[in-house]
Each structure stands twice: as structure tokens, then as C-alpha cells.
Amino acid sequence: MLERFVGQTSFVSQEDFKKNFKVNVPENFNFGYDVVDAWAEEEPEKKALCWTNDKGEHIDFTFAEMKKYTDQTAAYFQSLGIGRGDMVMLILKRRYEFWFSIIALHKLGAVVIPATHLLTKKDIVYRANAADIKMIVCAGEEVITKHIEDALPESPTIEHVVSVGPFVPSGFHDFHKEWENVPAFVRPVHANSNDDISLLYFTSGTTGNPKMVAHDFTYPLGHITTGCYWHNLHRDSLHLTIADTGWGKAVWGKLYGQWI
């Protein structure tokens, strides 16, 4: 996979790297199609994600399964009216549905806004109005869903809230129940251009209100250096990054460069 995007992959010195390392950026690059689906076609049984929790549950997902589930998630989000340019906040802690959701939203050309589960009502209201958030997908924990419920009356752009369970409040969509009954995913004719926004983070707001920091669809390619030359990962490496999915390190530490 790496060779698709980098002409020279090994180097004999720092000078060699500085002189010859170059990322080849495809037109209309989309991490969902050009990396996840490409792996699913080339090596469908290759392990993509090893997920576990503090209850001892353990699931290994192959790239074939990631394609299947991200397509299914994309179709589900399409059924809720999500498409290119729509703002979607993810408050999913370390749930595997985060990987389904972020890749599905990339496939739709939507804008992903990862957020920490520490957000309270005022934090959600501020972010929803600043970014015109259309949908929130959250972990089904009462402390999270309560803050979202309290924020909704002051967040007029939010049309849907989806819970991945186990708790699904009244008025929230049930991800796993509704997800099972969607039609086959139809890939958008033109999901994105390279300079479209794909990922948006809010800063911590240490000297005022949080600021929005946008990344375009080519952003994952920038983390080839992270996965290959900083983390020193190889083809079948197993890598652990301890980061809540609301933080930036979740995507640059356990998704983009690592899967390329």
C-alpha cells in the first residue's frame, strides 16, 4: 500500500530522506476508498483492527469486514440525509463504531468532528452552533446522552442524534437496530475534492473559546511519516495508541499512517 503513495520507501541517511522522500497525492484522494477499500480488494483477510475492552471482549476486524461495515454505516448515514460537506460530531470514546463511522463519513464526503466524552451541555451547544453540526453519533452512556439531550434545545442545526448503545434514550436513533435494515451503499459520484474539509477539531480553548482547526482530504497522507518513520511500523505490525477518539492523536496514532 505504501508504494502507491511514496516513490521511495527506504533511505540510507537523513540526507537521502530529505532529498528523495515525496508523497504522491492522487486526485480526489479519499482514505475510505483509496486505502481501506484498496486493502479489502488486495488482501481481504489482512487484520485491520484489534479491539478489546475492560470486560474482556475481543474482536479482530479484517479489511474485508471494515469495507463491509463502513459501507453499511455510510448507507445508514445516507438514509439520515448525511452527505458531502455535512458536519457530524463523533463522541464515541474507544468504541469500534468510531472506526466504522469516521471511514463511512469520509466515503460520503462529510466532515468529521471527533469530540471527547468530557463535553458538557455548554461545550456541545458552542460547538454545534459554531460548526453547524447536523448529526451527533455517541456512545450510549447516560452521562454522555444527558449532556446531548440538554444541549439540543439550544442547538437548532442538529437534526439527528445516534446512539451506538447500550443506552438509547427516547428520540435518539438506535445505531445497531436501524443499521441492520439499510439498503446497499451507493458510492457518491463525486464524494470529495482534495481541498474539501474532511476532519475538524476544536482546540482546548485555553485562552478563550475553542477554535476550529480544519484538515482536508489529503491529511491522512501526511501521516505516512508518522506510521512508517516515527512509529517504525511494518506490514504486519500490531500497534497500540492509548488515546480517546475525541483527541487528534486517535487519527494520527491509530488510523491513517498506520493503515497505509
Predicted regions and their residues:
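N-lobe entry segment of adenylate-forming
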Residues: 1-61, 65-78, 154-157, 167-170, ...
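Conserved pre-ATP/AMP-binding loop-to-beta segment of ANL
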Residues: 44-47, 163-170, 180-202, 209, ...
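Conserved AMP-binding/adenylate-forming core of the ANL superfamily
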Residues: 45, 49-103, 120-125, 175-177, ...
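Conserved AMP-binding A3 loop
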Residues: 59-64, 190, 198-222
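Conserved S/T- and glycine-rich ATP-binding loop of Class I adenylate-forming
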Residues: 88, 105, 136, 197, ...
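Conserved AMP-binding
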Residues: 92-95, 114-118, 243-248
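Structural core segment of the AMP-binding/adenylate-forming
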Residues: 100-103, 107-177
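Conserved AMP-binding/adenylation subdomain of ANL enzymes
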Residues: 221-260
